[in-house]
Design a protein with these regions (language model features):
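Active-site glycine- and acidic-residue-rich loops that bind
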Residues: 1-11, 67-74
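Auxiliary Fe-S-binding modules of radical SAM enzymes
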Residues: 16-144
Length: 144
């Protein structure tokens, strides 16, 4: 919740040095059982801008459209894909224990976020002009 623009710039510079195969980014979402419970959640549009910037900086990296995006906006995961994310990760946790993995309040557990909604997720991704590929998921680099 205390991240500044200067922090983000420093993070982007660090990522340039690191050249990671996968970059996860998502908005802050407060959790009721933490000292940050009263802090405002992260901004959807700022997160989407950063996903787009990361895509331009790292054309071959895997960048997930996170569950957090889908939790703060109904179409958050779709928006993430539209601005440059190229990975979705359905929730594979067994249904009887999902609520125990409670990273933040109002985490999306059902529908397209869950493995039970895989066909719906495939249709959604298809409608955006993309295809779901079930593979090991290695980053495709020019130098490899």
């Amino acid at each position: 919740p205390f991240q500044t623009s200067e922090n983000i710039i420093a993070d982007l510079r660090f990522l340039q040095e690191l050249q990671p195969d996968m970059i996860g980014i998502g908005p802050f979402i407060p959790h009721i059982d933490t000292p940050f419970r009263d802090k405002a959640q992260g901004d959807l549009h700022k997160t989407l801008r950063l996903v787009a910037i990361l895509r331009l900086m790292f054309p071959f990296s895997l960048i997930p459209s996170t569950t957090a995006l889908g939790s703060i906006a109904e179409n958050g995961r779709e928006l993430g894909l539209q601005v440059g994310a190229n990975v979705v990760m359905p929730n594979l946790s067994p249904t009887d224990v999902r609520k125990l993995y409670n990273l933040y309040n109002n985490k999306a557990f059902v529908g397209k976020e869950a493995v039970e909604g895989l066909e719906e997720l495939k249709a959604q991704v298809d409608s955006l002009g993309y295809k779901i590929v079930v593979s090991r998921g290695d980053a495709k680099r020019n130098d490899k």
